[in-house]
From Swiss-Prot:
The gene is petJ. It holds the Pfam family Cytochrome_CBB3. The lineage of its organism: Eukaryota, Viridiplantae, Chlorophyta, Ulvophyceae, TCBD clade. It is found in: Plastid, Chloroplast thylakoid lumen. Functions as an electron carrier between membrane-bound cytochrome b6-f and photosystem I in oxygenic photosynthesis. This is Cytochrome c6. PANTHER family: CYTOCHROME C6, CHLOROPLASTIC.
Length: 88
């Protein structure tokens, strides 16, 4: 798993503009809560599916693979997965 401290920093610096507190400011129905992620994310709620979404983007969400390194992506995925499962 990724480093949660790195993940928290990456989330705050890159993701929170749209996803603060697990929300989605661009597409309000597609939040980062467990029910929505399970329903809307390609592949459902899994580390692999979240990693793919972060790396490749989809819809309004940009791909981050050219801006974040593997350690940063693994960290932010671990951070998001933990928070989804704990209800932010």
């Amino acid at each position: 798993g990724g480093d949660l401290e790195i993940g928290a920093d990456v989330f705050t610096g890159n993701c929170a503009a749209c996803h603060a507190g697990g929300a989605n400011s661009v597409e309000p129905l597609k939040t980062l809560n467990k029910e929505d992620v399970t329903k809307y994310l390609d592949g459902g709620l899994s580390i692999e599916a979240i990693t793919s979404q972060v790396r490749n983007g989809k819809g309004a969400m940009p791909a981050w693979s050219d801006r974040l390194d593997d350690e940063e992506i693994d960290g932010v995925v671990a951070y998001v997965f933990k928070n989804i499962n704990e209800g932010w």
